[in-house]
Amino acid sequence: METTIHNLNGDKADTLELPAVFETPYRPDVIERAVVAAQANRKQPYGADPYAGMRTPAESFGSGRGMAHVPRENGQARRVPQAVSGRKAHPPKAEKDQSKSVNTKERKLAFQSAVAATADPSQVEERGHQFENDVELPLVVSDEFEELIKTQEVVDVLESLGVHADIVRSDENKSIRAGRGKTRGRKYRRPKSILFITSDEPSKAARNLAGADVVTAANVSAEDLAPGTQPGRLTVYTESAIKEVADR
């Protein structure tokens, strides 16, 4: 299976025999398991103070007063879960282990299957990405791409490759996040757009594009390739990066 290596003008520069990793069977179940585990392992432990609602000298009056046997302080119920200022019935525990494990072979299969999905136009299109009909996937560009330092230069390359519409889609579909997150520095939600995989340092010229991510071939994960457990992300590889991904 061959693919085209494009230069920065979008023209054909050479051809490349794709590594065997791009022929990995499609396994969305394994991909989902690996991505969910990665998300779970990033969670920060959280829990309630064990003594919350318990710092009170309240005691029950006992029988004979015609009132419930709940601990009271100045006539007001305390400590019990149904009382104002009482403890929580089953609060989250900070010591709870929220991590998830995935077998080594499963994790490797998930990564390889997610890589193979980036070469399937139907999977990429089903995920919502927009690109011209004559675009050949996977998209591979020459290593000169890693030397670009201006965002406008990257935009010009994407336009010549026929995939810039996906950046526009992500920018135009920006929405305000529901919930408290909007007041905590993450006001907007943007759809994921193009993933750039490079060989050396991540390209700073591409990282500011709407919805785009830039990672090295050594650090790319199944979650980068399948955000939200949905494989088939529109991906641009450099020539050196696609060879390094094959060795993962």
UniProtKB/Swiss-Prot annotation:
Record key words, sorted: Ribonucleoprotein, Ribosomal protein, RNA-binding, rRNA-binding
GO function terms (MF aspect): rRNA binding; structural constituent of ribosome
Matches recorded under Pfam families: Ribosomal_L4 (PF00573)
Superkingdom of the organism of origin: Archaea
TM helices/strands, residue ranges: none
Keyword Transferase: no
CC terms in the record's Gene Ontology section: ribonucleoprotein complex; ribosome
Extent of Basic and acidic residues compositional bias: 92-105
GO BP annotations listed: translation
Region (Disordered): 45-105
InterPro entries hit by this protein: Ribosomal_uL4, Ribosomal_uL4_dom_sf, Ribosomal_uL4_euk/arch, Ribosomall_uL4-arc
Task of the protein: One of the primary rRNA binding proteins, this protein initially binds near the 5'-end of the 23S rRNA. It is important during the early stages of 50S assembly. It makes multiple contacts with different domains of the 23S rRNA in the assembled 50S subunit and ribosome.
Cited NCBIfam families: rpl4p_arch
Subunit organization: Part of the 50S ribosomal subunit.
Stated family: Belongs to the universal ribosomal protein uL4 family.
The protein's name: Large ribosomal subunit protein uL4
Lineage, uppermost ranks: Archaea, Methanobacteriati, Methanobacteriota, Stenosarchaea group, Halobacteria
Gene this protein is translated from: rpl4
